[in-house]
Amino acid sequence: MKTITKIAIQKRAGRYSIELDNQFAFGVAESVLIKYGLAKGRTLDEDLITQIKYDDAIAKALTIALNYLGHALRTTKQIKQKMRDKAVDEDIQAQVIAQLTQLGYVDDQNYANHYVATKKLITPKGPHVIRLALQQAGVAENMIEQALATYTFDEQCSIATKIAEKLAQGYQRESTRLRQQKMVQGLVNKGFSFETAQLVVDSMNIDNNAEDEQNNAKRQAEKLWHRYRHDESQQRFYKVKRQLYAKGFTSELIDAALLSLEQEEV
């Protein structure tokens, strides 16, 4: 048996140093101090000391988790990883998660629901990107499905249309076909299905008028014509023509652009 000879407040708020038989033995959280009624003069056996230290380890891990939760919602996996980074034993992690779950501080379904709502309203993303992020956060598939069920097809199309409108502004110098392809790919990259992306882009009136399409073809042709300026004339001609086809311009526009360039060099 050992006797508590001194209890002192540590610099860290809510922490106390315990001396047994005039020697520092361990530190405890205030909650542990109160739980075990630790006071000067009390005697402790080894089993009780072990239990006190174990409960204090839980208290410290709980503080780590609560501080982490203070900044944002977290999943069970994320909180466990945070404790693991702080070298918290797995059995203590389990104890902390159980307490947090009971208190309602950890709820993976609530996290998933909130995440989907945020990605619809604040930082728009499609369901595929959202699903991947939730999977990486450790949310169970059934919870992901339940959360994504609130993301209706009409909402997806509405959000995708707004994103596509912004994308369209960045591709004004492309051919209509390439512009559409890049918009579809942009929406897919944002997490929308190819079918949804194609449907949205097809529903938008983004065709360049004839003059814009002609100017775009001429502009692209000039760049390519300059790039291949050291090639032989025929090889240069076919390289530029092939590149313009790949960029989605029609043969009529390509021929007109190349004819104009050849005439300028005469």
Swiss-Prot record:
High-level lineage: Bacteria, Bacillati, Bacillota, Bacilli, Lactobacillales
Family to which this protein belongs: Belongs to the RecX family.
The protein's name: Regulatory protein RecX
Keywords annotated in UniProt: Cytoplasm
Major location (coarse): cytoplasm
Subcellular location: Cytoplasm
Membrane-spanning segments: none
Classification via Gene3D superfamilies: Winged helix-like DNA-binding domain superfamily/Winged helix DNA-binding domain
GO biological process, one term: regulation of DNA repair
